[in-house]
From Swiss-Prot:
UniProt similarity note: Belongs to the dTDP-4-dehydrorhamnose reductase family.
Protein's UniProt name: dTDP-4-dehydrorhamnose reductase
One Pfam family in the UniProt entry: RmlD_sub_bind
Cofactor binding: number and manner: Binds 1 Mg(2+) ion per monomer.
Residues the UniProt record annotates as site (Could provide a fine-tuning to achieve optimal pKa matching between active site and substrate): T107
Pathway linked to the protein: Carbohydrate biosynthesis; dTDP-L-rhamnose biosynthesis; Antibiotic biosynthesis; streptomycin biosynthesis
């Protein structure tokens, strides 16, 4: 029997990289899914959000809509706040009106990124960028409006076949460049959208069953690495020489928004809720490769 017999799921931001992964996964598992991309629902429009949620009356809403342009947020703070801060509030208020659960995606950028140990879910936040501040505002809005049915799911370093991302860029650069410079002083967790979508589905089902407490969850592939270690691993899976990836520093590649130096996330809350956390990032990267290579028009390398 399907674990999703009747309840309807509403996915916002369904045309983005994560939404494109989550929507078909829910459909395959027998859920009734309404998928609304940016062209169908602007979450900054409170009236439109209330109307959509009232019309579809979902049991679970997963908000994949977000302003993810980290650097551009520094020069467009009001726009970023409208999407990342006010949008989740509109959704939370609409969910409260119909009794729906809300899964709100968030980010490692809510932390300062200056520590050296994995951040627990209850660790004090301290964003250093406009983007991080707007995402924290969205978290607070959801938890304020939906203390019993609001779920914050923090993730990081997303990649997948449904949109642009670091791994896809490395696949392209391996074909175009002799050597590639990648920063070696940022530590985090690459996260495959397929694995994240699977855990979102499990968390939503557990929320409906009353077995997963509301609050904050960290959802990244486990383990930790640097961009400069992820890039050579990508080259290796392509059958290319990993030594073509050369290290550089964040300072040398300065950008408008500061990047966290260390933003590895602890996932203890999954087991406390009776759910398995995501697997190790290396296993996920290996399994993701056929889809990523297919999107890039590259043949999938055989075993070496």
């Amino acid at each position: 029997m399907s674990p999703y017999p009747r309840p309807r799921w509403l996915v916002t931001g369904a045309s983005g990289m994560l939404g494109r992964e989550l929507t078909p996964l829910l459909d395959r598992r027998g859920a009734a899914v309404t998928a609304l991309g940016r062209g169908h629902l602007d979450i900054t429009d409170g009236a439109a959000v209330r109307s959509a949620v009232a019309e579809h009356r979902p049991a679970v809403v997963v908000n994949c809509a977000a302003w993810t342009a980290v650097d551009e947020a520094e020069s467009e703070p009001a726009l970023a706040m409208a999407v990342n801060g006010e949008g989740p509030r509109h959704l939370a208020q609409a969910c409260r009106a119909v009794g729906a659960v809300l899964l709100q995606l968030s980010t490692d950028y809510v932390f300062p990124g200056s520590g050296g140990r994995p951040y627990r879910e209850d660790h004090p936040t301290g964003p250093r960028t406009v983007y991080g501040c707007t995402k924290r505002a969205g978290e607070r809005a959801v938890l304020e409006v939906l203390p019993d049915t609001g779920y914050i799911v923090r993730t990081a370093w997303l990649y997948g076949a449904g949109g642009p991302n670091f791994v896809a860029k490395m696949i392209r650069l391996e074909a175009d460049e002799d050597t590639v410079l990648v920063v070696d002083d940022q530590h985090g967790q690459p996260t495959w959208t397929a694995d994240l979508a699977d855990r979102l589905a499990a968390l939503g089902a557990a929320a409906l069953a009353g077995t997963a407490p509301a609050g904050i969850y960290h959802a990244t592939n486990t383990g930790g690495t640097t961009w400069n270690a992820l890039a050579p691993e990508t080259f290796r899976l392509l059958g290319a020489d990993p030594a073509r990836v050369r290290p550089t520093t964040s300072l040398a590649l300065a950008r408008p928004a500061v990047r966290p130096r260390y933003s590895v996330l602890d996932q203890s809350r999954w087991k406390a809720a009776g759910l398995e956390p995501l697997r190790h990032w290396r296993a996920a990267l290996t399994e993701s490769f056929p889809a990523l290579c297919g999107r890039a028009g590259r043949p999938v390398p055989g075993p070496r």
